[in-house]
Amino acid sequence: MQYRKQIGWWLMTGVIMIVIQVVLGGITRLTGSGLSITEWKPILGSIPPMNEADWNHAFDLYKTATGQYKYLNADFTLSDFKFIYFWEWLHRNWARFIGVVFLLPFAWFWYKKAFTPEMVPKLIALFVLGIAQGLIGWIMVKSGLTDDNLYVSHIRLAIHFVSALVLLAFTWWFAMDVMIPSSARQSNPSYHRWVTFILGLLLLQLVYGAFMAGLKAASAASTWPDINGSYFPEALKHQNWVNHPIVVHFVHRTLAYVLFAAIIFLSIQSAKMGGSVLWKKWRFFPMILVFIQVLLGIGSVLMATETQRNGFGAFEWAAQIHQIVAMFLVMALLFHLYLVRDQKS
């Protein structure tokens, strides 16, 4: 197919841009910037305040629409507000830019009749997932635009994060399907099932990672290997597996240990397998990433009492890199899942 390589690189550009968007989302959350823009204007919202009067109006909206200002940021100056506004504005505008980078080449490829029939439903799904992600983001922000909440709902935050990862995973899989020759793939049903199981565990872990972020649960137990002096904290008796910071923290740590062991086992199995040069080059990448991820998680917990309000210190850096490595781990495992099929075809 004449345009297959170009379509593949177009999709890979989308993958890179989605990764950047998730990073920007993490920075927006860590700097406390997510509630700074209190309106949702998909088109006109791309234009920031252009003069002092516009800035004061935007600041007044933030003051009146959020409990966050009243109870947490009442000492803010206009300069402070401009800092948090910038990150939320950049996060939203990068999403708009992704839309442009999707639609313009799509129109050109469509005009050139470059798409195969099996690509069309996938492209429609990509478009729907992208639009849905924008809507989910606004629904999340709305949960924080009240007099009672300092932050957005941690449950809606988790939905927003996981839906972004679904979009990333779908685009990444689509790109691999276009770019990787079938000769690079092999069949091993048991290995394929094991990777699928680990991805399921990782999805649950990522949900709890978002809960950790939304509930500020790292600072609720800034100790390791124990959790505030106990390995099985009293809070487990509450059996609130979604809303209690200590319980969420316990689940996130426990899943990390299980995933670490599972991926080490996966790497031992991959070492016994032959395969293409591509496979041999990247088969141990999940193991490397999970080692880094565990260290980052421990470091983030131990530094969680040193958070900077509306700033970026050591904890914020560790937490942000922790999120980035999580995305790479998802992509690495999907790469394994793609290269090692469930059956011959």
Locations of regions flagged by a protein language model:
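Hydrophobic cores of alpha-helical transmembrane segments in multi-pass inner/ER membrane proteins
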Residues: 98-104, 161-178, 258-265, 324-340
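Small-polar-interrupted transmembrane alpha-helices in polytopic inner-membrane proteins
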Residues: 13, 17-21, 121-141, 197-205, ...
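Individual transmembrane alpha-helix segments
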Residues: 61-100, 242-259
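Membrane-interface helix-loop-helix junctions at transmembrane boundaries of multi-pass membrane enzymes
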Residues: 110-124, 189, 268-286
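Interfacial helix-loop-helix junctions of multi-pass membrane proteins
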Residues: 28-39, 135-157, 213-222, 294-327
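Membrane-interface transmembrane-helix boundary segments in multi-pass integral membrane proteins
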Residues: 242-249, 253, 310-335
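Membrane-interfacial catalytic/cofactor-binding modules of polytopic membrane enzymes
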Residues: 206-253, 258, 268-271
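N-terminal signal-anchor transmembrane alpha helix
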Residues: 9-46, 200-213
